[in-house]
Amino acid sequence: MGLGRARFYELYSNYLHACAHSQADAWSPGRSGGDHHPDWSAAVTALLTKLLSSKPASSYSAAASELHRRLGFQTDRASVRRWALQNRLAPDTRYKQAPQPVKRWQVRDWGALWQYDASPHAWLPCSLDKQVLLDLIDDATRYNTGARLYPSETLLSHFDFLSRTFQAHGLPLALYVDYHSFFYTHNPDAFTQLGAALHFYGVALRYAPTPQAKGKIERRHDYWQKRLPPLLAADQILELCGANHLLDQLLPHANQHEIHRELGTTPHAARDLALTEKRSVLRPAPACPWWPYVWSQRTHVRVGDDGKVPVHDQRHSIAAPPRSTVVRCLRPDGDLFYLQHAPDPKAKPLVLLHCPVF
């Protein structure tokens, strides 16, 4: 008959209704009117072919999201899957058991806790090396506040990522992290350099006892690992600069348009609701003169008897007495500063020497 399941049960319900009113002899199925959906444009089918033919191929949900982001064409995962099966472009994916619903603990306020983690993975196509994705997600709203790729996980990459994200969104009360040496020291009264930078601006560290305890950020890693490499392969993006440019476009789209399964709404809508209900503890990034030096790798250097300090493979004169101790600050962008003393909220920075990277 060529009827779909939904149409069949609709007719069956109408027939039973007619029988209940003694009108079975006069009942007729009528006409459905046919398929009113217009054919997909050439641009839509071309983009779908590109995304589903790449190695690895994009998932159906990722392809539907890209149609909306790039072409403004809104469809669902099921329609993309049906088109892919008809055109022999279905990715060869194994059956996965549907996840069981789990009620997870979460904080109440926007900005109370951000889950933070790094994901080493072969993000770039045709690359033998692994790159690192640094990722931040708000625990209350699932708002992905930041995601950026780096060649490796270093102290400078953490400084660069966190300072960017804090300037864009503000300062949370705490970060939820693991026991990596970047965050944790066995002395409870001491800070790592990264911990000291966070403490300077009132951001605490909370430690997850197991990887499973950081489930929200781990699932976000899985989301990016399934979505980003196929898109990079489809667009032939082979460098970190281009990959981060694509991430800057994907991140707001995911926050604003993709429904989160546990929340039943988009992270953007969840954040707006928290703001409306005055459930926000996020603080704006301060206009602090110490900001570029707090987010830098600092070491203490002794001025030589010649009144000079090392700068790369050279020695430069500095406005400090010989044999005195100064603070060397290496910025993520490569700029080098020498300060008279370490960051102190009760004082202002005194720059003794600045050596730009260019």
What is each stretch, according to the model?
Residues 1-15:
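Double-stranded DNA-binding cores of transcription factors and transposases
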Residues 8-11, 48, 63, 80, ...:
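Mobile genetic element proteins and their domesticated derivatives, centered on retroelements
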Residues 13-122, 270-275:
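Basic, flexible linker segments flanking DNA-binding modules
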Residues 73, 84-137, 143-144, 155-164, ...:
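Mobile-element integrase/transposase regions
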Residues 138-139, 150-154, 358:
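A short acidic/small-residue loop/turn micro-motif
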Residues 166-188, 208-211:
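Acidic/histidine-rich, metal-coordinating catalytic segments
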Residues 194-284, 332:
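Charged alpha-helix within mobile-element recombinases
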Residues 251-358:
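C-terminal, beta-rich DNA-binding module of retroviral/retroelements integrases
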